[in-house]
UniProtKB/Swiss-Prot annotation:
Cofactor needs: a divalent metal cation
The protein's annotated pathway: Aromatic compound metabolism; 4-hydroxyphenylacetate degradation; pyruvate and succinate semialdehyde from 4-hydroxyphenylacetate: step 7/7
Role, per record: Catalyzes the reversible retro-aldol cleavage of 4-hydroxy-2-ketoheptane-1,7-dioate (HKHD) to pyruvate and succinic semialdehyde.
InterPro entries to which the protein is assigned, alphabetical: Aldolase/citrate-lyase_domain (IPR005000), HKHD_aldolase_ent (IPR023701), HpaI (IPR012689), HpcH-HpaI_aldolase (IPR050251), Pyrv/PenolPyrv_kinase-like_dom (IPR015813), Pyrv_kinase-like_dom_sf (IPR040442)
Family from the record: Belongs to the HpcH/HpaI aldolase family.
Protein name: 4-hydroxy-2-oxo-heptane-1,7-dioate aldolase
Domain of life: Bacteria
Length: 263
């Protein structure tokens, strides 16, 4: 068994990604052909569930782009289900300390190394027990990325980096800026200083730093500092802003007056 995303991180080669929030296998396949190294299937802020994650994994599978799946929480039950449908690389949100990082790793490993439940006969991940010796190979193929998104997590970064089985640490600029008192302003100098320091610290510890940043100069700056997995856009934003720009070129103005509410 191989995990190309994990192998590339270990080799120290940067990977450029795109965030998927449309929760749709058709758009996921469309974007899988765009050339990004990795695609993040978001279960935290997008309307995904295990079934929609499965269909997107199937849609991306024929393409070189590598899928990364973000569950809604650091929950071993949810993690087990995502691994069984074929996710190998997980991005665990809102990890605050080393204990939570250890819990995330344990949820991805079969016993005795962890607590992942054994159900390989039912699992796409094992090709329904068609992969020889899957139970003994699976642990090494798992890639665990944890998100640090608060001042508390930043203060615990050194101990998080010491946790065996953590392959990368992803800095969440939106939540971090809010926690630091600069909601909606991840480009504030204090936030940027925290991000840059974290990238350097993560890389120095032998782990892979990651981030989502649609601002192109900042994304390139993070890559220069040593970030190894950087998402540079979001599918919903590309679609919304692209459609708005096209409409504007023909003199069409946005009109939301008929919208009665969020429903």
């Amino acid at each position: 068994m191989k995990n190309a995303f994990k192998d590339t991180l270990k080799a120290g080669r940067p990977q450029i990604g795109l965030w998927l929030g449309l929760a749709n296998s058709y758009s996921a396949e469309l974007l899988a052909g765009a050339g990004f190294d990795w695609l993040l299937i978001d279960g935290e802020h997008a309307p995904n569930n295990v079934q929609t994650v499965l269909t997107q994994l199937q849609a991306i599978a024929p393409y070189p782009s590598q899928p990364v799946v973000r569950p809604s929480w650091n929950d071993p039950v949810q993690i087990k289900q995502l691994l069984d449908v074929g996710a190998q690389t997980l991005l665990i949100p809102m990890v605050q300390n080393a204990d939570e990082a250890r819990n995330a790793v344990a949820a991805t490993r079969y016993p005795p190394a962890g607590i992942r439940g054994v159900g390989s006969a039912l699992a796409r991940a094992s090709r329904w027990n068609r992969i020889p010796d899957y139970l003994h190979q699976a642990n090494d193929a798992m890639c665990v990325l944890v998100q640090i998104e608060t001042r508390e997590a930043m203060s615990n970064l050194a101990s998080i980096l010491d946790v065996d089985g953590i392959d990368g640490v992803f800095i969440g600029p939106a939540d971090l800026s809010a926690d630091m008192g600069f909601a909606g302003n991840p480009q504030h100098p204090e936030v940027q200083a925290a991000i840059e320091n974290a990238i350097v610290q993560i890389r120095a510890a032998g782990k892979a730093p990651g981030i989502l940043m649609a601002n192109e100069p900042l994304a390139k700056r993070y890559l220069e500092l040593g970030a190894l997995f950087v998402a540079v856009g979001v599918d919903t934003t590309l679609l919304a802003r692209g459609a708005e720009a096209l409409a504007a070129r023909f003199g069409v103005e946005k009109n939301l007056s008929g919208a009665s509410g969020v429903y």
